[in-house]
Amino acid sequence: MDLTPKVKFLGMTFDVTLMIGSVVSALIVLLLVFLLTRKLSVRPGGRQNVMEYVIDFVSGITGMMLEKKESARYLSFALTTFLFILVANLLGVVVMVTATAHGPIPSLGITAADLKLTDSVSWFKSPTSDINVTVAMAGAIFLYSHFAGIAKSPLGYLQHYVKPFWWMLPIHIIDEVSKPATHALRLWANIFAGEVLILILREGTFYFTGIPLFAWMGFSVFVGCIQAYIFTVLAMVYIAQKVGEE
């Protein structure tokens, strides 16, 4: 396993690889949306068609969960979530940056003891291949869905925990607690496992692992797209359960 550079700030430790990957993912999404939405016209061209297709696709996700007026409020959120996770998932398939450390780097948390295990330092990977990122995103969606439900109808929010029977309260609580855990673990496990296998195949002899490597990279692109879709759908499901009319 490659070493991960870390920095300490205000008593907290930050993973440099994750910060680079997350910032790059966000910048790529920003740049893509900026380029695809320049010079909009009534008769859309190629770039505008691509953006409109993506918006229609995500609008279909929100429309499945909420009424038309309500779903429009969450379109920007769902679009941003889908694009960020999609780009973050695919970055590790396309780009993995590692370097060789020739000596300890205390400022990045790399010690001589670490170098005895390996001298390979990871500088870039998919942010979603780290469980801390997926837990943070799933946790934020979990908290927001509850706050949105309370803000819309405090009494209705509390009543759903005892429906259809009061003795189902513990079951509802377990269900709510398990949602962010499964939401985060599903995304992380799929992306992490894919990157680990890519690293293993990359270290092998090209004559034996070359074809399996390219085949798995192609499959990883498919998995990355599917997982971005699933994460966004589940996010909207959890929010719709709290703010939906039914």
Residue spans for each PLM region:
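Selective transmembrane helix interface/packing segments
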Residues: 1-246
